[in-house]
C-alpha cells in the first residue's frame, strides 16, 4: 500500500493584477465578450495639429537668413525706402525680427565708413551716395557699353584727324606747292554753295586772329587782327552768270584796306619790319 506524501507548498510568484484579471476572464465563458477590443475614439485633427506643431518647432531658419550679410541687405532696403534716409532702429529690429544688438552691428560699421550718422540714440540718417539708382543695373550696363563704343569711335576719329593733319603739313611744307597756294575768282565762282551770296576773302599773315562777336539782328561783325603784317580783304560777290568780281555791295562795311579783286599773290621781299594791322568788317542783311 502506497503512502501519500504530503503536498509541498510551492513558493508564491508575483503576478500582475492585470494579467490575473485576464486569466480569470478566460476561464469564465460568460465574460468572453470582455476580451474583445474596446473602441477607442481618436481625434485625428488633434493629432495632426500636434504633429505639425512638433515639426514647426524642429524647423530652423537657414544660417544665411540670420547672417550679417542678409541683415545688411534688408537694412539697405529699408534705408532706400525711408523718407530722408532716416530710420528708427527699434522699428528696424522689429521688421527684421532680430535683436537691436544685431542692428547696432550694422550701423556701427556704416558709421565707421561715413555712410550713416546718428541723429539720436535710436535714429540714424543715411549720408552716403544716392541709392535710387543702385537698382538700375541693366541700364547702367547698357550705358557702359555705349560709353565703350563712343570711346572706340573717338579713338578712330583722333587717328583720322592726326592723319589729315600730317597730310596737310606735308602739303603746305612742300616747296613745290608753295607757289600754287592761292585761289582765283573762278575757283570761288565754281562752288555752287557760294552762288547768290557775298563772299569776303581775307589774305593775312600767319598767326592772324579772327573774332566773330555774337551776331546782331541785321548784321554780322568780324574782327581780324594781325601783328606780323598787313591784312588784305577782297570782296567777291558771287552771282549766277557773273564773270567779274568788281561789283560792290552797299551792305558791306568799309575796312582799313580797300576791297580789290582776287589776284595771283606775288611774293615780295619784306624790307620793313612787320606792321600791326586790324580789319573790322560788318555785313548787313
Curated annotation (Swiss-Prot):
Task: Output the superkingdom of the source species.
Answer: Eukaryota
Q: Where is the composition biased (Polar residues)?
A: 241-259
* Functional description taken from the UniProt entry: Inhibitor of E2F-dependent transcription. Binds DNA cooperatively with DP proteins through the E2 recognition site, 5'-TTTC[CG]CGC-3'. Has a preference for the 5'-TTTCCCGC-3' E2F recognition site. E2F6 lacks the transcriptional activation and pocket protein binding domains. Appears to regulate a subset of E2F-dependent genes whose products are required for entry into the cell cycle but not for normal cell cycle progression. Represses expression of some meiosis-specific genes, including SLC25A31/ANT4.
Question: Gene name on record?
Answer: E2F6
Keywords, sorted A to Z: Cell cycle, DNA-binding, Isopeptide bond, Nucleus, Repressor, Transcription, Transcription regulation, Ubl conjugation
SUBUNIT field: Forms heterodimers with DP family members TFDP1 or TFDP2. Component of the DRTF1/E2F transcription factor complex. Part of the E2F6.com-1 complex in G0 phase composed of E2F6, MGA, MAX, TFDP1, CBX3, BAT8, EUHMTASE1, RING1, RNF2, MBLR, L3MBTL2 and YAF2. Component of some MLL1/MLL complex, at least composed of the core components KMT2A/MLL1, ASH2L, HCFC1/HCF1, WDR5 and RBBP5, as well as the facultative components BACC1, CHD8, E2F6, HSP70, INO80C, KANSL1, LAS1L, MAX, MCRS1, MGA, KAT8/MOF, PELP1, PHF20, PRP31, RING2, RUVB1/TIP49A, RUVB2/TIP49B, SENP3, TAF1, TAF4, TAF6, TAF7, TAF9 and TEX10.
Q: Where is this cross-link: Glycyl lysine isopeptide (Lys-Gly) (interchain with G-Cter in SUMO2)?
A: 9
Intervals of motif DEF box: 95-129
Q: Where in the cell is it found?
A: Nucleus
The keyword Ubl conjugation is assigned to this record:
yes
Report any Pfam family annotated for this entry: E2F_TDP
Record protein name field: Transcription factor E2F6
* GO cellular component term, pick one: MLL1 complex
Amino acid at each position: 500500500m502506497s503512502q501519500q506524501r504530503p503536498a509541498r507548498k510551492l513558493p508564491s510568484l508575483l503576478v500582475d493584477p492585470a494579467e490575473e484579471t485576464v486569466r480569470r476572464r478566460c476561464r469564465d465563458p460568460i465574460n468572453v465578450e470582455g476580451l474583445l477590443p474596446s473602441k477607442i475614439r481618436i481625434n485625428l485633427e488633434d493629432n495632426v495639429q500636434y504633429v505639425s506643431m512638433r515639426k514647426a518647432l524642429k524647423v530652423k531658419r537657414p544660417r544665411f537668413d540670420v547672417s550679417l550679410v542678409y541683415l545688411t541687405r534688408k537694412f539697405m532696403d529699408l534705408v532706400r525706402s525711408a523718407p530722408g534716409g532716416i530710420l528708427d532702429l527699434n522699428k528696424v529690429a522689429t521688421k527684421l525680427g532680430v535683436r537691436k544688438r544685431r542692428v547696432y552691428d550694422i550701423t556701427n560699421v556704416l558709421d565707421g565708413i561715413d555712410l550713416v550718422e546718428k541723429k539720436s540714440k535710436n535714429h540714424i540718417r543715411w549720408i552716403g551716395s544716392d541709392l535710387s539708382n543702385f537698382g538700375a543695373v541693366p541700364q547702367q550696363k547698357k550705358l557702359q557699353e555705349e560709353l565703350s563704343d563712343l570711346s572706340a569711335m573717338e579713338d578712330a576719329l583722333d587717328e583720322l584727324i592726326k592723319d589729315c593733319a600730317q597730310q596737310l603739313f606735308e602739303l603746305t611744307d612742300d616747296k613745290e606747292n608753295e607757289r600754287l597756294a592761292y585761289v582765283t575768282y573762278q575757283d570761288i565762282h565754281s562752288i555752287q554753295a557760294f552762288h547768290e551770296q557775298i563772299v569776303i576773302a581775307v589774305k593775312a599773315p600767319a598767326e592772324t586772329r579772327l573774332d566773330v562777336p555774337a551776331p546782331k539782328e541785321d548784321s554780322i561783325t568780324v574782327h581780324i587782327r594781325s601783328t606780323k603784317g598787313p591784312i588784305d580783304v577782297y570782296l567777291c560777290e558771287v552771282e549766277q552768270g557773273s564773270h567779274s568780281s568788281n561789283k560792290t555791295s552797299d551792305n558791306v562795311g568799309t575796312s582799313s584796306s580797300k576791297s580789290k579783286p582776287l589776284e595771283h599773290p606775288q611774293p615780295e621781299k619784306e624790307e620793313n619790319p612787320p606792321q600791326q594791322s586790324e580789319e573790322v568788317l560788318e555785313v548787313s542783311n
